[in-house]
Swiss-Prot record:
One Pfam family here: NQR2_RnfD_RnfE
Bilayer topology: Multi-pass membrane protein
One GO cellular component term noted in the UniProt record for this chain: plasma membrane
Organism: Actinobacillus pleuropneumoniae serotype 5b (strain L20)
Chain positions found as FMN phosphoryl threonine: T186
Protein name (Swiss-Prot/TrEMBL): Ion-translocating oxidoreductase complex subunit D
Localization in the cell: Cell inner membrane
Membrane-spanning residues: 15-35, 36-56, 67-87, 88-108, 125-145, 212-232, 241-261, 265-285, 298-318, 320-340
Protein keywords: Cell inner membrane, Cell membrane, Electron transport, Flavoprotein, FMN, Membrane, Phosphoprotein, Translocase, Transmembrane, Transmembrane helix, Transport
C-alpha cells in the first residue's frame, strides 16, 4: 500500500546547507574585491561575525536541548553573519558587529522560533537597528586604501577595529580627512551631501566618482552581479525578485532623469554605487522572508525597487536597501495570499 503525501515529493536533509553554501561561495568574489579596495578590516569583521554566530547557534541548540548540528549545520547563522559583516564599514568598532550578530540571531531569528519562522530578514533587522542607533560608526567607511597616503597595515586594521585608532593614533575619520575633495566615504553619501553645492556634473567629476575610487565600488557591485547570476544559473535563487527590483528602480530612476534632468545621479551610477546588486541577489532573495509565489516574487521585488527609489530620492538615507527589504517583508503575507496559483481542477 502506498502512502499518499502532498508535494514536495523529494526531501533532502542537507538541502538548506547546500543552498546556504552556494550563496556564500557566490559572495566570495565580492568579499575579495571589498578586501582588496578597503583592506584587512573586512576579514577582521567577517572573522568576528562568524565566530560569534557559531557560538550563539551552539548555545541556542544547548538551551533548546537540540543536537548542536541542528542549528549549526544548516549554515543559516553563518550566512547571516557573513551578510552583516560585509554590510558594515570594515573598520567599524568590534562592538558594532557583536551587537549586530546578537540582534540578528537572537532577536530577529530565534525569538521567532528559528530558521523558517522569522518574518524579517535577520541581517537587515540588525543593520537597520545599528544604522539608526550608531549612525557615526555605521557611516565610517574608509576610501579605497590606494588613495590614502599611508594605507592601514594588518596591525593598524586590528587596532582600528578594537581601539578606534591606528598604531599612529589616527581614527578612520582622520584618515578620510587626509584625502582631498572627499566629504563622505561612499559615492551615495557624497552625492547626497554635495549635490546642492556642486550639482550633478560637479559630483561626477569629484574624486569620489572618478579614477580608482569609482572603479572600486563598480567592481564590487559587478562581483555581486556575477555571483547573483551564478546563483540564478544554479537555480539557487529565482530570477523574478532581482529582475523586478532592479527593473522597477531603473524605470523610476530613468523617468526622473527624463523629467527632472541634472537633479540626481544617473541610473547607472545609482545601480553600481551602493548596495543595489548586493541587495537584489543576496538579501531580497532570502527564501524565508520573501514571497513564495511566482507572481508574488515579481511584486515583492518591484516593491523593494520602489521603496529604494523613494528613500534614495526623497528620504534621508542615501542607500535604503535594508529599510526597503524590511518594508517589503511586511507585505509578504498579503502578497502571497492574493497571488496563490489556482489549483488544477479547482474553481475560480
Amino acid at each position: 500500500m502506498f502512502k499518499m503525501v502532498s508535494s514536495p515529493h523529494t526531501h533532502s536533509s542537507n538541502l538548506t546547507a547546500k543552498f546556504m553554501l552556494w550563496v556564500m561561495v557566490a559572495m566570495l568574489p565580492a568579499l575579495g574585491m571589498q578586501a582588496y579596495f578597503f583592506g584587512y578590516g573586512v576579514f577582521i569583521q567577517v572573522f568576528i561575525a562568524l565566530l560569534l554566530a557559531v557560538a550563539i547557534e551552539i548555545a541556542i541548540a544547548k538551551l533548546r536541548r537540540k543536537p548542536t548540528a541542528f542549528y549549526v549545520a544548516d549554515l543559516s547563522g553563518v550566512l547571516t553573519a557573513l551578510i552583516l559583516a560585509i554590510s558594515i564599514p570594515p573598520y567599524a568598532p568590534y562592538w558594532i558587529i557583536v551587537i549586530g550578530i546578537i540582534v540578528a540571531l537572537l532577536l530577529a531569528k530565534h525569538s521567532y522560533g528559528g530558521l523558517g519562522q522569522n518574518l524579517f530578514n535577520p541581517a537587515m533587522v540588525a543593520y537597520a537597528l545599528l544604522l539608526v542607533s550608531f549612525p557615526v560608526q555605521m557611516t565610517g567607511w574608509l576610501v579605497p586604501i590606494d588613495l590614502l597616503n599611508e594605507p592601514p597595515t594588518f596591525g593598524d586594521a586590528i587596532s582600528l577595529v578594537f581601539s578606534g585608532v591606528t598604531s599612529d593614533g589616527f581614527s578612520v575619520h582622520q584618515l578620510l580627512g587626509s584625502v582631498d575633495g572627499i566629504a563622505q566615504a561612499t559615492p551615495l553619501d557624497s552625492a547626497k551631501t554635495s549635490m546642492q553645492k556642486l550639482g550633478v556634473e560637479g559630483v561626477l567629476q569629484s574624486p569620489i566618482f572618478s579614477g580608482l575610487f569609482a572603479n572600486g565600488w563598480w567592481q564590487i557591485n559587478l562581483a555581486f552581479l556575477a555571483g547573483g547570476l551564478l546563483l540564478i544559473y544554479k537555480r539557487i535563487i529565482h530570477w523574478q525578485i532581482p529582475a523586478a527590483m532592479l527593473g522597477m528602480f531603473a524605470l523610476l530612476s530613468g523617468l526622473t532623469d527624463l523629467l527632472l534632468p541634472h537633479t540626481h545621479l544617473n541610473v547607472v551610477s545609482q545601480l553600481f554605487s551602493g548596495a543595489m546588486m548586493f541587495g537584489a541577489f543576496f538579501i531580497a532573495t532570502d527564501p524565508v522572508t520573501a514571497s513564495i509565489t511566482p507572481r508574488g516574487k515579481l511584486i515583492f521585488g518591484g516593491l523593494i525597487g520602489l521603496f529604494v527609489y523613494l528613500i534614495r530620492y526623497y528620504g534621508n538615507y542615501p542607500d535604503a536597501v535594508a529599510f526597503s527589504v524590511l518594508l517589503a517583508n511586511i507585505c509578504v503575507p498579503l502578497i502571497d495570499h492574493y497571488t496563490q496559483p489556482r489549483l488544477y481542477g479547482s474553481g475560480r
